[in-house]
Amino acid sequence: MLTRSKHGIYKPKAIQVQVDYTSQEPPSFSIASKHPQWVAAMDAEYQSLQKQETWSLVPLPPHKNIVTCKWVYKLKRHSDGSIARYKARLVARGYLQQFGMDYDETFSPVVKPATVRLLLALAVQFGWELRQLDVSNAFLHGILKEEVFMAQPQGYIDPAFPKHVCLLHKALYGLKQAPRAWFERFTTQLLHIGFCASTADGNLFILRHDSCIVFLLLYVDDIIITGNNSKFVTSIIKQLGMDFDLKDLGLLHYFLGLQIDYTSSGLFVHQTKYATDLIQKFGMTDCKPCKTPSSPNSHLLPNDSPLLSDPTPYRSLVGALQYLTFTRPDLSLAVQQACQHMSSPTHNHLQAAKRILRYLQGTLHFGIAFTPGPISLSAYSDSDWAGDPMDRRSLTGMVIFLGNSPISWSAKKQGTVSRSSTEAEYRALASTTAELYWIRMLLRDFGIFLPHPPLLWCDNVSALAIATNPVFHARTKHIEVDYHFVREKVLRRDVMLKFISTHDQLADLFTKSLPSPRFNWLTSKLMWKFPTRLRGDERHHNATSNGCPEHTNHEEEDGTPTARTPTATFHKTMSCSVIRKHKGRSKQNATVPH
């Protein structure tokens, strides 16, 4: 058999590229050990571990599970992207732990996004100073209850005892029970100095002393603290600093990827840097922006194209997009659709996820704003009946406002198949009512008692009739549980139901993939564009001409709720002036904390 000659065919030579790991995170210890900045960071981490007596060296015990560890490197950056410091962290390989031997309980709660947004809104309303705290090596404050043995860290093996292992006393990062141990340790100390946990969210802590009140919000080791007396807040920070290695980062500007900007109108919260980094990570920097995050009237179907050979990039992208919905309600529906195909993503699903990135490219500076005004709750509830062509389950969409500001929203598939559009709308009403009731409980923990029930706007007359008329018949008896729940809240005046036209239904944004004119109109009612004067480019022209945001709580001046349809409401503008104190806030519509 004749074969083709290999004359003139050569193996390509690998091109050696020098990577500057002083501006990038090294992937391994061998690379990091060649750069003095990262060596200094590892030395600082190791000394901190030794100072806190994280472990003691013991001979290798027989028949015990040994967990290894590794160094993880992170560049800590300022909100503008510049390098703040080099961080090296020793992390245990917790996936090597064995249940019942070296770990048991692992659950640790985190604060709900709506709680964060509500705290920011109330801080603007009452002029509370928002301060940010960070606990260095937070997990190391947690005390382990189980025996955990770990191999000595690479580069720091004791020459006198090279065969010994580390018996851990503190909850090192990476251990399965580390977050729980830290949460128990910190909350125990908070309760000791007088804080009490919110009944609505266990990560919100409240301290009342005479006329002073302090609110502390905990998200793992990141903390927001605020209150009506700055000196008293400072004293609490000093008291906590006596028990933990606490850093007072000053005024809140950057929290969990959220950028908080201060204007004369209040706060503007956005994730511009996070979105920019995400677009760059997936190589979409030069992509052409599109007007909507999903194609109008489109549905993502399983097995509609070949499966991805590696689903990891898709899952990583959708997970990152899911976090962007913290300040981007306009992404909720598109991300919800993408999340349904995590197990078996196809090429079409990946293209749909990349379309969201294209939409982000054109709307990088969008976010939500918190401005002072009358305190009232209003909500919008909608559903897309049998919208999923595969299982014919309906979709619930809702958005809840505190005054002018959206504080909670969602696009979620209903758990059961609805036999009629009325049933789907009624189940959406029940879900929105439950969320409203929870937010009202949260407001009470803040010391705020609303004089009027929240308004819940629905565009289905039949669903409203079921809620207000105690009549059962063959078509509604199977939704009896939801019926009793909503009916009870209406009778107790925990919520007031009102009809709204489909055109004015803001929750429509969360139930259907809309054409760009309708989508942009609804988005303009929920979101603001970052004041361009603060960015240094041309001024953004807002929808309103008078420069003042219109009321969104549908109340008359005396606070009495009305059935006025909000066709012209939610037109928002944001002043671009420098920071200054808010004056003349309206507080007449609620009993507020002092």
Label the model's feature ranges.
Residues M1-D245:
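Metal/cofactor- and membrane transport-associated sequence elements
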Residues R4, F29, M42-E45, L49, ...:
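Mobile genetic element proteins and their domesticated derivatives, centered on retroelements
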Residues S28, K34, A44-Q47, K51, ...:
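Alpha-helical coiled-coil heptad-repeat oligomerization segments
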Residues P61-V67, A123-G127, Y359-S383, L450:
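Structured nucleic-acid-interacting core domains from mobile-element enzymes and related host factors
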Residues R89, R93-Y95, L321, Y380-T422:
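RNase H-like nuclease fold core
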Residues A114, L120, L172, Q177, ...:
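C-terminal reverse transcriptase regions that engage the nucleic-acid substrate
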Residues Y254, H341, P374-S376, S394, ...:
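RNase H-like nuclease module associated with reverse transcription
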